[in-house]
């Protein structure tokens, strides 16, 4: 059932986006020929004021077709610039056209902002780690100061309760930071010159190896492991936390290992046989600490929501930058519709507020991707970019020039979509294997 809810949620986010284009087109007297919820052949359609409204079966999409979308094609065939109708997309000013393109992402931003406000006022439920840390890199520059299992109590005399608190009190710029740490019942204080980014590269949250769930037909299931079990060692190598496990599996060459785990105080040993080269065990670990943060007043909720939106957009822009500059590594994180629905479905199991919060972030991702991917004209950012350049030039590009830009952008867009589907399929195969 939660998969269906997640599909409907994704469809609703796209509906909000297309509604922005629709309303601004109506505002500027541009004829909306078709407004469709879903894609594919229509299962329900009706016409009001020269606009055909459709409901289509594939709810992982939707569109708003404005009059003038085929204008460039007509110009290309005629091999000359044609005069556009006043109620078409090419019959209005560049500025109005930019606003119509911008309206889709704008509505997603407004939707997320409003939802964040209500969630904050209702009491935000989310998950966090304790301030107990582990060293992510065995060659870490901070390993001389920190040890696996250290509990950070204070940073510059500011109390630390959760791992996310470290982001608030460790400066962005490299500077001298005082740490108060609890290590094996002993309080230790030391100074270290570090920036937040460098710190997070070297130090991560401590995650215990207590199993929350086991995937059917997985190596762990076949080995007899159950929820509540705690992994102790693999091939007699003691594993203290998830970082140890990830590091061990990353450097493992064998397909068969001996795993030891505890259950209700009793130690069990079993053979673990891997099905694929990625060494997927087939287990989910227990979630970190549950936190409830109550925002008491509207002004605080508005302020927190604004910074949450800005921070998310910065992360999206940085992700696009990584995709462009470090494609081989970043491309592994690209998800298609199946992966997106999977993420929403997983968040649903953590509670309704957490699920709604995830929907809001997904709405921000849709807005950010549409705005920042200016090289893809099928995205709003690409259309805005073209219209803005035409506004500066004082005249339109020739149809051939725009079509060349479209051809590259559509190819790149389809490539990203195909990459997302490939990653979705690979993820599904890993689960079923």
From Swiss-Prot:
<dbReference type="InterPro" id="IPR008915">
    <property type="entry name" value="Peptidase_M50"/>
</dbReference>
<dbReference type="GO" id="GO:0005886">
    <property type="term" value="C:plasma membrane"/>
</dbReference>
<feature type="domain" description="PDZ">
    <location>
        <begin position="193"/>
        <end position="265"/>
    </location>
</feature>
<protein>
    <recommendedName>
        <fullName>Putative zinc metalloprotease BB_0118</fullName>
        <ecNumber>3.4.24.-</ecNumber>
    </recommendedName>
</protein>
<dbReference type="GO" id="GO:0006508">
    <property type="term" value="P:proteolysis"/>
</dbReference>
<keyword id="KW-0472">Membrane</keyword>
<dbReference type="InterPro" id="IPR004387">
    <property type="entry name" value="Pept_M50_Zn"/>
</dbReference>
<dbReference type="InterPro" id="IPR001478">
    <property type="entry name" value="PDZ"/>
</dbReference>
<dbReference type="InterPro" id="IPR041489">
    <property type="entry name" value="PDZ_6"/>
</dbReference>
<dbReference type="Pfam" id="PF02163">
    <property type="entry name" value="Peptidase_M50"/>
</dbReference>
<dbReference type="Pfam" id="PF17820">
    <property type="entry name" value="PDZ_6"/>
</dbReference>
<comment type="similarity">
    <text>Belongs to the peptidase M50B family.</text>
</comment>
<keyword id="KW-1003">Cell membrane</keyword>
<keyword id="KW-0482">Metalloprotease</keyword>
<keyword id="KW-0645">Protease</keyword>
<keyword id="KW-0378">Hydrolase</keyword>
<keyword id="KW-0812">Transmembrane</keyword>
<keyword id="KW-1133">Transmembrane helix</keyword>
<feature type="transmembrane region" description="Helical">
    <location>
        <begin position="366"/>
        <end position="388"/>
    </location>
</feature>
<dbReference type="GO" id="GO:0004222">
    <property type="term" value="F:metalloendopeptidase activity"/>
</dbReference>
<dbReference type="GO" id="GO:0046872">
    <property type="term" value="F:metal ion binding"/>
</dbReference>
<feature type="binding site">
    <location>
        <position position="21"/>
    </location>
    <ligand>
        <name>Zn(2+)</name>
    </ligand>
</feature>
<keyword id="KW-0862">Zinc</keyword>
<feature type="active site">
    <location>
        <position position="18"/>
    </location>
</feature>
<feature type="binding site">
    <location>
        <position position="17"/>
    </location>
    <ligand>
        <name>Zn(2+)</name>
    </ligand>
</feature>
<keyword id="KW-0479">Metal-binding</keyword>
<feature type="transmembrane region" description="Helical">
    <location>
        <begin position="334"/>
        <end position="356"/>
    </location>
</feature>
<keyword id="KW-0997">Cell inner membrane</keyword>
<feature type="transmembrane region" description="Helical">
    <location>
        <begin position="401"/>
        <end position="423"/>
    </location>
</feature>
<dbReference type="InterPro" id="IPR036034">
    <property type="entry name" value="PDZ_sf"/>
</dbReference>
<feature type="transmembrane region" description="Helical">
    <location>
        <begin position="98"/>
        <end position="120"/>
    </location>
</feature>
């Amino acid at each position: 059932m939660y998969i269906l809810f997640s599909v409907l949620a994704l469809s609703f986010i796209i509906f909000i986006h297309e509604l922005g284009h629709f309303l601004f087109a109506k505002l500027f007297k541009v004829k909306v020929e078709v407004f469709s919820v879903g894609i594919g052949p229509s299962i329900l359609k009706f016409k009001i004021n020269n606009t055909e409204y459709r409901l289509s079966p594939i709810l992982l999409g939707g569109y708003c077709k404005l009059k003038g979308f085929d204008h460039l094609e007509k110009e290309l065939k005629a091999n000359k610039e044609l005069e556009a109708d006043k109620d078409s997309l090419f019959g209005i000013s560049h500025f109005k056209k930019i606003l119509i393109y911008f309206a889709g992402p704008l509505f997603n931003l407004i939707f997320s902002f409003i939802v964040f406000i209500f969630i904050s006022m209702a009491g935000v439920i989310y998950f966090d780690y304790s301030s107990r840390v582990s060293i992510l890199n065995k060659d870490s520059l901070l390993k001389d100061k920190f040890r696996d299992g250290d509990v950070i109590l204070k940073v510059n005399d500011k109390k630390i309760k959760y791992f996310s608190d470290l982001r608030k009190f460790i400066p962005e710029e490299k500077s001298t930071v005082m740490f108060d740490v609890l290590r094996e019942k002993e309080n230790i204080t030391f100074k270290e010159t570090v920036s937040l980014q460098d710190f997070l590269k070297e130090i991560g949250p401590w995650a215990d190896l207590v199993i929350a769930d086991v995937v059917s037909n997985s190596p762990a299931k076949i080995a007899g492991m159950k929820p509540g079990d705690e992994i102790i060692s693999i091939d007699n190598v003691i594993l203290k936390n998830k970082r140890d496990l990830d590091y061990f599996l990353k450097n493992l060459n064998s397909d068969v290992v001996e795993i030891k785990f505890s259950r209700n105080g009793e130690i069990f040993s079993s053979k673990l046989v891997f099905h694929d080269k990625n060494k997927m065990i087939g287990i989910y670990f227990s979630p970190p600490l549950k936190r409830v943060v109550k925002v008491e007043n509207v002004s605080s909720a508005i302020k927190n929501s604004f910074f949450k939106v800005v921070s998310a957009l910065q992360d999206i822009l940085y992700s696009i930058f990584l995709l462009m500059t470090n494609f081989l590594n970043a491309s592994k994180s690209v998800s298609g519709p199946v992966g997106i629905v999977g993420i929403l479905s997983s968040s649903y199991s953590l509670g309704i507020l957490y699920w709604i919060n995830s929907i809001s972030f997904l709405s921000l991702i849709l807005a950010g991707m549409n705005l920042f991917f200016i090289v893809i004209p099928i995205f709003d950012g690409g259309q805005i970019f073209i219209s803005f350049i035409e506004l500066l030039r004082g005249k339109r590009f020739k149809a051939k020039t725009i079509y060349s830009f479209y051809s590259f952008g559509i190819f790149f867009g389809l490539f990203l979509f195909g990459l997302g589907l490939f990653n979705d399929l690979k993820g599904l195969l890993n689960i079923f294997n």
